[in-house]
Each structure stands twice: as C-alpha cells, then as structure tokens.
C-alpha cells in the first residue's frame, strides 16, 4: 500500500535490533484517516473470504482492526493481555512470548464471542516472529472456528512469522512488506516488483 | 444518543456494585458501525471547540477515540498503562487509581505528541469516579496544552467523575448518561427530559 510505505519512509525510525518505530501514526499516536484507508484496503483484499468476525490483540491492533471492521461491517473482538490468567472457565486463552520485551503474556477472549460458524480474520499491527498470530491461531483452534486470513499492517518478511503462517496454509496479506533495513533505510518488497 | 441507549438496554448487563457490562459492543467485542456513529456524534458536539488532537487511554478508549478522530480528521494519542514507570525523561506520566480493580497504574504519553498550541479533546469509554480523566488532566497540565473538552461514551452521573470535571470548568459531553440502576434495569437522564 503506497500511502503506508510513504508514511513509513517519512515518519518511521529504524532502531538497533531491526526495530521499526512508527509511534507517530500507528501504535501510540494514530492517524485515523490513514487507519481508515488501511481498513478499506483490508476489506478489499478479503472481500471474498466470507469474514464474519475480526480478531486482534490489545492495544496496537485495535485501531486497524476496528477500521477494517467498519469497512466490512463485522464485529471486532480484541484479546486482552494478562500477566497470568485465573478464572478461565469462560475464556479461551493462549500464551504469547514477546521477543522484544522478553516476557510471556497470556491473551484471552470471552468464549461467547467466538461461535463455531464464525470465519475469523486476524489483524495485527506488526508481523515479526508471529507470536501474537500464533496465540490467535491457538484461540481459534480452541473455539473450532475457521480462520479466513491474516491481515498485517507492517510485516518484516525476513523474520519467522511469515513462514509460520504459510506453513499453516492461511492466507496472509500485509499492507507494507519490509524486506530489509540498510542502516536507517527501509526497503520494501514493492521495490522489487517496481524495478 | 438514542442508538447507544437502545444498545445498552439490549446488550448491557448490570452486575453487583453498580457495574454495567457492555463487553458485547464496547470494550471487548466492538461494534465498528456503532463506534463510527459515536465518533460522528462527538465530532458534531465538539465541532466549534477547535480540537487539534484527541487523547485517550488504552485499551477501551481507543475504538471510540479513533472514530472521533476519523470524523474530525485529527490525530489520536493513546496513553499507555504501566504498573510502574522508569526512564521517564521523554514521557508525561500520571498515576491513575482504579476503584474497580483496586490497584494503581501509571499512564504515560511521549512528550513529542503534545505541543503547547494543542487543544486536546479527552475521550474515554466510561466515566465513573473520573480517575482516568483526572490522569489525562494531569498530563495535559504538564504539557501546558488547552483542554477542549471531555467526551465520554457512558457516564454514571451519580458517581464523582461528573463533579470533578465540572469543578475544573471543562465541558463534558456524554453519549449516554446513566442516572441509576434499579435491579437489572438501567435509567438514563434522557428519560427525564422525555417525560
């Protein structure tokens, strides 16, 4: 998505450890008009996927997910993060390891919000090692729902998350695919196709 | 806002301790179309307030705040919650006590996202004792920005948050004002004006 790539080049900052900081428009300060454009793009990409519900993880996934939900007119459920989980009778839970923070969290959603006939689109702001997506897969499996696809705002294709989703045979659409960092420069997969 | 009140009556559940559970459309599962209608209503209510930025607190405030931001075409910043705060040089922080959870959290936002000429609209999903709003007031004061108003999705007018905002002389607009719970029945301020 050209508009997003341009914004990353303009406002993103590359930090040591191949971390891209985009807190100016995506995950701390949010640009709602850009989010809406992204939601519309997700709706377009998954228009034939029979999506009945969108699932994401708090907090950074919420803005892109609700905009996709607005464009697709389907409900959005955001999984809650906890240090630990108690009283889990009414919850589907999964453990998610964060490579950035080097800690484990549990994510959970109330069972009543996933029905067996749901076709669920998973949305998240970043795809790196795919731990959050894997946690959402686990929750979907426990709920016996069909996964309609995975929609990612910014994907680092050189990390392991991409393969994890491919191995599962689930369709992945990322609005910006970063192939490499070169010092503080960001390279996108779209550069190759444009060349 | 009639549509919101009807949804509360249909899907809300009153729990002991005057807690209204609305996890079916507001703070766990989200109805994006209703959120957009609410965002449009906030934009209408504050159209003459000169709003340059919206501030909210993760996670439940994000969906209504980004929809208001979409309708007003202004950026949205969501404050992060932490158990404790370290490395605060670049952050504005405030302590927020939760009466529901009986714990204190710190909220923070990066200093660079509040400029002295900003006129900030504070948005949150619930107003009860007003602790989150008070935390946002504190952050705005530290940043020397003007507070353009407070927009709340569901207000419990019989708790102390309403007065806290009135005492500060800040304009408050709530899309649903709950005056009392009567067993599992919810009463709105609009019932009085309609009578």
Curated annotation (Swiss-Prot), chains A, B:
Keyword match DNA repair: no
Enzyme Commission number: 2.4.2.22
Binding site for xanthine: 20, 27, 156
Subcellular locations according to the entry: Cytoplasm
Domain of life: Bacteria
A GO-annotated cellular component: cytoplasm
Keyword terms, alphabetized: Cytoplasm, Glycosyltransferase, Purine salvage, Transferase
Binding positions for 5-phospho-alpha-D-ribose 1-diphosphate per the UniProt entry: 128-132
Functional pathway: Purine metabolism; XMP biosynthesis via salvage pathway; XMP from xanthine: step 1/1
Principal subcellular localization: cytoplasm
Entry similarity comment: Belongs to the purine/pyrimidine phosphoribosyltransferase family. Xpt subfamily.
Assembly with partners or alone: Homodimer.
NCBIfam families: PRK09219.1, XPRTase
Name of the protein this chain belongs to: Xanthine phosphoribosyltransferase
Species annotation: Lactiplantibacillus plantarum (strain ATCC BAA-793 / NCIMB 8826 / WCFS1) (Lactobacillus plantarum)
Gene name for this UniProt entry: xpt
């Amino acid at each position: 998505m050209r508009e997003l790539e341009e914004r990353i080049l303009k406002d993103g900052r590359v930090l040591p450890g191949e971390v891209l900081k985009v807190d100016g428009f995506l995950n701390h300060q949010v640009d709602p008009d850009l989010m809406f454009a992204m939601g519309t793009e997700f709706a377009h990409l998954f228009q034939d996927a029979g999506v009945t519900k969108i699932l994401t993880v708090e907090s950074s996934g919420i803005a892109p997910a609700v905009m996709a939900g607005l464009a697709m007119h389907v409900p959005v459920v955001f999984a809650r993060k906890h240090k630990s989980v108690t009283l889990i009778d009414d919850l589907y839970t999964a453990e998610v390891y964060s490579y950035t923070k080097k800690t484990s969290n549990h994510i959970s959603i109330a069972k009543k919000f996933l029905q067996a006939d749901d076709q669920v689109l998973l949305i998240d702001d970043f795809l790196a090692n795919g731990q959050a997506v894997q946690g959402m897969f686990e929750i979907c499996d426990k709920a016996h729902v069909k996964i309609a696809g995975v929609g990612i705002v910014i994907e680092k294709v050189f990390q392991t998350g991409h393969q994890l989703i491919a191995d599962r045979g689930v369709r992945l659409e990322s609005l910006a695919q970063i192939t490499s960092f070169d010092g503080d420069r960001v390279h996108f997969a779209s550069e190759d196709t444009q060349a």
